[in-house]
């Protein structure tokens, strides 16, 4: 098991720059092959690819981003994105919840941390940028957890809602499984508190 995890982590490192170049290409190419770098999911949360330094002003000034949830490992953002200290100088708080690229599944604990982080900024009327490398899997899983918490949706409903806005997300079976565990926790807690309402969407 440990050997498999090491192999997967090593493969993710080897493929990082080739797959990032592909993401950059899809962000620049016109027509049907084009993929927007990020999308606004609701008044609080934006889901996207790496927040490159060139996007900083747009995110902070235009999108009112005051929190960033980074699902990447440190090596993925070292040269291309603001450091935690640089974000802080801009008035932005960064929460890093490192998850291996391509095969990684966010932990249940990290989903809970990320959701509470987003809810904090929701209460302040400010926005949170949730990202991984391409904004398709790791970060989409986190945003799905946030929607489950906010709307009491099922994992499938949350994923469908995101896909309507950002059609090229890709939630893997293991990621859906952890969302089901998260939903189970939310449902149990809400039922105990008498606040659970079955979604009609």
Curated annotation (Swiss-Prot):
Pfam families: DSPc. One of its GO terms (biological process) is cardiolipin biosynthetic process. Residues 1-27 form a transit peptide. It catalyses: a 1,2-diacyl-sn-glycero-3-phospho-(1'-sn-glycero-3'-phosphate) + H2O = a 1,2-diacyl-sn-glycero-3-phospho-(1'-sn-glycerol) + phosphate; O-phospho-L-tyrosyl-[protein] + H2O = L-tyrosyl-[protein] + phosphate; O-phospho-L-seryl-[protein] + H2O = L-seryl-[protein] + phosphate; O-phospho-L-threonyl-[protein] + H2O = L-threonyl-[protein] + phosphate. Keywords: Hydrolase, Lipid biosynthesis, Lipid metabolism, Membrane, Mitochondrion, Mitochondrion inner membrane, Phospholipid biosynthesis, Phospholipid metabolism, Protein phosphatase, Transit peptide. Its EC number is 3.1.3.27, 3.1.3.16, 3.1.3.48. It is a peripheral membrane protein. Pathway: Phospholipid metabolism; phosphatidylglycerol biosynthesis; phosphatidylglycerol from CDP-diacylglycerol: step 2/2. Residues 37-188 form the Tyrosine-protein phosphatase domain. Lipid phosphatase which dephosphorylates phosphatidylglycerophosphate (PGP) to phosphatidylglycerol (PG). PGP is an essential intermediate in the biosynthetic pathway of cardiolipin, a mitochondrial-specific phospholipid regulating the membrane integrity and activities of the organelle. Has also been shown to display phosphatase activity toward phosphoprotein substrates, specifically mediates dephosphorylation of mitochondrial proteins, thereby playing an essential role in ATP production. Belongs to the protein-tyrosine phosphatase family. Non-receptor class dual specificity subfamily. Interacts with STYXL1; the interaction inhibits PTPMT1 catalytic activity. This is Phosphatidylglycerophosphatase and protein-tyrosine phosphatase 1.
